[in-house]
Amino acid sequence: MKFSIAAAVLALASAVVAHPGAGYVSTPEKEANFQQNFQKFVTACGNGNQVSCCNTETKKVGAPLTAGGLIPILDNINLEDFSLLKGCSKVDVAAVIGVQDLLNSNCKTQVSCCKVGDTNQVGLVNANVDLKCAAQNII
């Protein structure tokens, strides 16, 4: 897997905005601000990656969890806010108008930056999740 988890998490952390609460009311100013932040997220996601909507959070990874030497790259990453996801589908970033309402109604879990292409898992233990997605809330 050539996807740099640390780079993706760093890029996503720079584009994070708060998720609107139940009493959230959209205004033209809020929509424009969201569109600007969403475009920053798309840019931070980078080439060879795509913005995806992931509707199933398989496991919330916490800071006490360690890879136990099985996955050395994860030993040096703060996993407190990292999630394993499945059920991810591409978000069409060309249609940014009303994207906040689209994401709020269709993305039940998180908007993520995902590596384009198949995730090949090789080894004794394989997870039934999209390991190619770095998940971080942006809405």
Curated annotation (Swiss-Prot):
Pfam families: Hydrophobin (PF01185). Keywords: Cell wall, Disulfide bond, Secreted, Signal, Virulence. InterPro entries: Hydrophobin, Hydrophobin_CS. Its main location: secreted. The keyword Magnesium does not apply. It is found in: Secreted; Secreted, Cell wall. One of its GO terms (molecular function) is structural constituent of cell wall. Transmembrane segments: none annotated. Residues 1-18 form the signal peptide. Disruption phenotype: Leads to a 'wettable' phenotype with drops of water attaching to the mycelium, whereas water drops off the wild-type colonies. Conidia show a strongly reduced tendency to float at the water-air interface of conidial suspensions. Triggers an increased activation of human neutrophil granulocytes and dendritic cells, characterized by an increased release of the immune mediators interleukin-6 (IL-6), IL-8, IL-10, and tumor necrosis factor alpha (TNF-alpha). GO terms for cellular component: extracellular region; fungal-type cell wall. Disulfide bonds join C45-C113, C53-C107, C54-C88, C114-C133. Self-assembles to form functional amyloid fibrils called rodlets. Self-assembly into fibrillar rodlets occurs spontaneously at hydrophobic:hydrophilic interfaces and the rodlets further associate laterally to form amphipathic monolayers. Aerial growth, conidiation, and dispersal of filamentous fungi in the environment rely upon a capability of their secreting small amphipathic proteins called hydrophobins (HPBs) with low sequence identity. Class I can self-assemble into an outermost layer of rodlet bundles on aerial cell surfaces, conferring cellular hydrophobicity that supports fungal growth, development and dispersal; whereas Class II form highly ordered films at water-air interfaces through intermolecular interactions but contribute nothing to the rodlet structure. Belongs to the fungal hydrophobin family. This is Class I hydrophobin A.
